[in-house]
Amino acid sequence: MASSCSQALRHHACKSSKILRIHLQKSWTNRSFAAYQQPDVSSQEEIVIPKKKTWSKEAVLQALASTVKRDPTASDYRLQDDSFLTPKTASDFKLFCRSQESGRNAAKYFINKYPKYFEKDYAQPHIPCLMPETLDAQLEDVSEAALKERIQLRKVKAAVDLYDQLLQAGTSVSLDLTNDLLDLICLYGEADPVQETFEAEQRSEEMEDIQDETQTKKGRSPKASDLLKTSWKENNNAERIFGLLSEPNTRSYSALIRGMVKHAAYTQAFSTYTDLLNNRLKADVHIFNALLAAVPAVRPKYNEKWELILDLLKQMAEQKVKPNLLTLNAILKSLRRCGALGRSQAFPVISEMKVLSIEPSLASYNHLLAIFYRSGAQVQTPTDVLVEVMNEVSGKSFTPQDPDDAQFFTTAMRVCLDTKDMEQAYRVHELLGVGDNWRFMGSDFQQSIYYAWFFSLLCMMENIDVVMKWYRDLVPSVYYPSSNAMSDLLRALDTDSRLDLIPKIWKDMKQLGHGNRQQLVEEVLTLMAREKHCPEVQESFADCALDIMKMYDTNERGKVIMSWTASSLSDVTTILLAANRKQEAWEMLKLFRTHNRVPSAELLNQFVTCVKEAGQVSQAVELVQISAAFCLSETPKLIQRVQQEFELSEEHKNILSDLEIQTFNGD
């Protein structure tokens, strides 16, 4: 009975809820709320499902990285592992980077030496450089497959030996594979690339050490052409293998000619090109690019160089070879060595290339600036060329297209420094922050030169507030200033009469490793001792001078020991006297005799003035004795002044009389 009643109630409730739902739906359709209006069947639009976009695994990281800017208070990204080991000087930074690179090379050696212990890949996404490389050939038989493997591994000597074995065995090697071998030999020469790179690193380190000492403003980055002076030997493996070809094609000639140009065999390259034409073959764009770059080496006069360039371009047109960006850059690079003729032809060449839809790259603009602005020469070119270049490149993000792209920013900043154009320097630096343009800064050496020129121009052209703003932004997060740069900063402080900042700058000098640079230290002392300031500034100067004294007394291993000069002793003493540090100044006066230095008469007169204010007659007489001991010509005048301005006892009068007689007899 109870169960039948409950079932009846449940059935009635369900029926009531259905009736209520139907009623509500009818009432909602009569209302004007758009959210509940049923769309018309005829007005339905077809839903188009967009195509799936595939994102790289680094896309999120790249998006996050684009939202932040460089933190001027943070260290370089390479130094984030251990903040306690962060270098504070340029030499420490170089040592740190080399040590870090040495550690990477050691790790890479063990990974490649014992690959079986590093088979599991933990990195997500995959990082190829953390996994073992295949450096040893797996195929030991004498076959084309084994030769192809050695070419891919860039084993120059092993590939040449295997090629000779194939020919001795009577096995013919395909022309394409032989051309691959020629490409390898002509690129690396007779040596394997690993050995070549090691030697290049050693020579690069030696060159940087020399240039760091001798060049700061006039320096340039070491180029590969300076480091690798491999010569093209006659009848080398490339020429021998090329001679064994029964019917060499254009690619064979291209490899040989490009190799000759790369290794400075320019005359042989043009001779080989003549052989190509005699065999009724057409050159490709790579051959013409190499020959255009070699023009300055085979023609001595400017007009002859330009005529040869025109002749090569005409031959390109006759052979229907379309030029590319590297063609433009090769022409501009050759025009850099054509003097005034190059300046007259540079813009027409760029205009002609633009007609062919060839847009200049950063390397093109770098060559253009080098054509119009000679490094180290008296600048007579109007700055509108620099302005036109910056108008073309401003706001653009560039991608690498030419190895010389990395030279643009250094060249542009050098031109800004030579022309004293601060506005364009700001534009160059602004361009550096657009997109991934920072990747074109090149090596650490190039980066240091770029910032050295930029900072030197700031010190020369801007007021000290702007200079200090950039100084705090750049140092030491991206730039370790040299002693010359710190000297420029001191001159900027002197120009704007902000010598009160010298104590802060001195602390930075010590931190940056310039505390033992005697010329720079003496410049700091001279500026502080030159004129008097308010008592607060004089107190800070005195503390700074006493701190500098410690640098003279410090004898740390591996650091240059500074020697006291008469001017440095006089400057420190003058600074202490100006701050009413008489006792400390008196101790400094004793150092003149200790280091065999002679104080100036002006310094002794300053001492007499301070002693007079304190009423210390004994010290005044002692000053006269010191002057007489050094046989200064001003001693008689000093005796007379003490006799007139001080109340002397009989003992003091007798001492001065004896000194006066000794001085007279000495004269």
Swiss-Prot record:
The protein's name: Small ribosomal subunit protein mS39
Segments for region (Disordered): 199-226
GO cellular component: mitochondrion; ribonucleoprotein complex; ribosome
Targeting presequence: 1-11
Keywords: Mitochondrion, Repeat, Ribonucleoprotein, Ribosomal protein, RNA-binding, rRNA-binding, Transit peptide, Translation regulation
Keyword hit for rRNA-binding: yes
Organism of this sequence: Danio rerio
Listed GO biological process terms: mitochondrial translation; regulation of translation
Chain positions of PPR repeats: 249-283, 284-323, 324-360, 361-400, 482-516, 565-599
Family of this protein: Belongs to the mitochondrion-specific ribosomal protein mS39 family.
Pfam families given in the database record: PPR_3, Rib_mS39_PPR
Main location: mitochondrion
Protein role: Mitochondrial RNA-binding protein that may have a role in mitochondrial translation.
InterPro entries in the cross-refs: Pentatricopeptide_rpt, PTCD3, Rib_mS39_PPR, TPR-like_helical_dom_sf
GO MF term (any one): rRNA binding
Cellular compartment(s): Mitochondrion
